[in-house]
From Swiss-Prot:
This protein maintains pilus integrity and thus is an important participant in pilus assembly. It may function as molecular chaperone directly or indirectly in the correct assembly of PapA subunits. InterPro entries: PapJ. Keywords: Chaperone, Periplasm, Signal. This is Protein PapJ. It comes from the Bacteria. Pfam families: PapJ (PF14855). One of its GO terms (cellular component) is periplasmic space. It comes from Escherichia coli.
Length: 193
């Protein structure tokens, strides 16, 4: 089989071009790597407009779509119902939103539901140590299956009287302007399991 010289040169040029194009396209693929999520990686720090780092993403346990938030910053202190004992105070109902996945009600499985417990803390300074006398009795444990629910806290009678006295004093003195100087402020500490 005799091949023309010009045809052989054209075949060699086409073969070298296809090899070059194939190598060029594969080189582009080699530069792409899988973006694996690592919670403590430095690339997950947020950078502000001045080039400073403002925070980091920290993950532990099961990653949920959103943490719980209070629907309102105000919690009404109701009068003690007659059917409660003298030792127990009136329950405080805290409406929460955005808990868990916020989807339809699903059976409690790991990764779907979330167990929440919390406590109300009195006194100024969110970073201060939680002394036993400054911590109200714990809120009920509940399993959250939906995106909207409530947390029920039951202060005892002594703590309820203390809250009522603080509310009365703050109302008379008009000290609602500065949250740090107002000892009547309650802070909610929510723990996720």
């Amino acid at each position: 089989m005799v091949v023309n010289k010009t045809t052989a040169v054209l075949y060699l040029i086409a073969l070298s071009l296809s090899g070059f194009i194939h190598t060029f396209l594969r080189a582009e693929e080699r530069g792409i790597y899988d973006d694996v999520f690592t919670a403590d990686a430095l690339r997950h720090y947020r950078i502000n407009e001045r080039g400073g780092r403002t925070g980091s993403l920290t993950c532990s346990g099961a990653l949920l779509s959103s943490p719980c938030t209070l629907v309102s910053n105000e919690v009404p202190l109701s009068l003690r119902p007659e059917n409660h004992s003298a030792a127990a105070g009136a329950p405080l109902m805290l409406r929460l939103a955005g808990c868990g996945d916020g989807g339809a009600l699903q059976p409690g499985k790991r990764g779907v539901a979330m167990t929440v417990s919390g406590s109300l803390v009195t006194g100024p300074g969110s970073g201060s140590a939680l002394l036993p006398d400054r911590k109200l009795s714990g809120c009920d444990h509940l399993v959250i299956h939906d995106g909207d629910t409530f947390l029920l806290c039951r202060p005892d009678r002594r703590q309820e009287e203390m809250l009522a006295a603080w509310r009365k004093r703050a109302t008379q003195e008009g000290e609602y302007s500065d949250a740090r100087s107002n000892p009547a402020m309650l802070r909610l500490s929510i723990k996720y399991e």
